[in-house]
Regions:
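Buried hydrophobic positions in well-ordered alpha/beta secondary-structure cores of metabolic enzymes
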Residues: 31, 41, 64, 104, ...
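Alpha-helix C-terminal capping segments
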Residues: 11-18, 35-47, 65-66, 148-154, ...
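Active-site/ligand-binding loops adjacent to catalytic centers
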Residues: 88, 153-228, 264-321
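Glycine-rich ThDP/TPP pyrophosphate-binding loop and its adjacent helix/strand module
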Residues: 115-159
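Small/polar-residue-rich loop-to-helix segments that shape phosphate-bearing ligand pockets
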Residues: 54-133, 165-212, 296-297
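Helix-rich "cap/lid" substructures immediately adjacent to catalytic or cofactor-binding pockets
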Residues: 1-23
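A short, small-residue-rich loop immediately preceding and capping a beta-strand
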Residues: 20-53, 131-144
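Catalytic phosphate/nucleotide-handling subdomain of diverse soluble enzymes
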Residues: 238-274, 281
Length: 321
């Protein structure tokens, strides 16, 4: 999924002259954005420097290295917020040492939204402008937020449903912890500037074990080998289809299942029948509870902890057209 985002962002930077062939692009990522940025840099003759964690598996590691990416892996700590902060600190050190580097800032620069315009156009063309519901992991906010924004700007009635892991600060669930792990890519322990909270109508919070069951079902039932974030979105989309009276429900499958082979698919025997699962209905974030909660967000503003000091001082999120 991130390929369209990273590739279009790099193309725009080159068009604007903000980077030139031979320059180095830098960011923090331990997943599919790292791979997407490495592909874009490889295509356009740019250097790629990624600060990731030790959770990067051997398959991704080998791909990044062979694509010419310089990869630094920061050791994990017991605290996810500290992990993310350490990686950002290392990025800032690298920028100080290499002022000619360009920091992509995938979580804060809305240039990453541009690549989703053609996808929004395709959705609108295939559905003929019919009202629809989009379901997907929130993460950096670029994919779900941009698709909804571009479709709404074109006159399509879009209900936007975001999917989050427990423990994520983005929509105020940092007080509920998942004993297994936070699902990579769809939540965060630090604020993200690209998340436009007022775009979302409904939120689902889904635990690791529940997403495991959904990812397993997605493969068994539909032959789609996708990751945990895709499984979580699939589960939420099934529920939204159940409670909504009309209109198609489209969900975003962000990544393949390869990196989850050991953590998820080798544990398929522990998967529950998702037909037996239903979300707890929460009125506000104080009522969130494991393993699955659903709440109306009604396009409300960001919760207090989801905006950093840097964010509050910066300009509001602006969407590139």
């Amino acid at each position: 999924m991130k390929v369209v985002s990273a590739l279009t962002a790099v193309e725009r930077l080159l068009e604007q002259g903000r980077v030139r062939p031979g320059d180095t692009l830098l960011d923090s990522s331990s997943g599919i954005y790292a791979y997407a940025l490495a592909l874009a840099c490889h295509k356009y003759g740019l250097g790629c420097h990624i600060v990731g964690s030790t959770t990067i598996d051997s398959t991704l590691y080998n791909q990044l290295v062979l694509l010419g990416c310089r990869l630094e892996q920061v050791e994990l700590s017991a605290d996810l917020k500290l992990d993310q902060s350490l990686r950002v600190r290392r990025v800032r050190q690298l920028l100080a040492e290499n002022p000619h580097y360009h920091w992509m800032r995938q979580y804060h620069d809305d240039i990453h939204c541009l690549g989703y315009r053609p996808i929004a156009d395709r959705i609108r063309a295939e559905l003929g402008g019919e009202a629809l519901t989009i379901v997907g992991g929130v993460g950096s906010g670029a994919s779900t937020g941009a698709l909804a924004r571009y479709l709404r700007d074109a006159g399509t009635d879009v209900g936007l449903v975001g999917v989050q892991p427990f423990g994520s600060i983005t929509f105020g669930a940092e007080h509920v912890s998942d004993s297994e792990m936070i699902i990579a890519g769809i939540g965060s322990s630090i604020p993200f500037g690209n998340v436009e909270h007022t775009a979302y109508d409904t939120l689902h919070w889904i635990s690791f074990d529940t997403a495991l069951s959904a990812s397993t079902d997605l493969l068994r039932r539909h032959a789609v080998f996708a990751g945990l974030s895709s499984g979580a979105a699939y589960l939420a989309a099934r529920w939204e289809r159940h409670v909504r009276s009309s209109g198609p429900v489209l969900f975003i499958a962000a990544d393949t299942g390869h990196r989850y082979n050991e953590a998820v698919f080798s544990r398929a025997e522990s998967a529950r029948d998702i037909a037996e699962l239903a979300p707890h209905s929460a009125v506000d974030t104080t009522e969130l509870t494991m393993p699955w909660s659903r709440m109306r967000w009604d396009r409300a503003e960001a919760p207090p902890n989801a905006r950093s000091e840097e964010e509050r001082e910066a300009m509001p999120v602006k969407w590139s057209r």
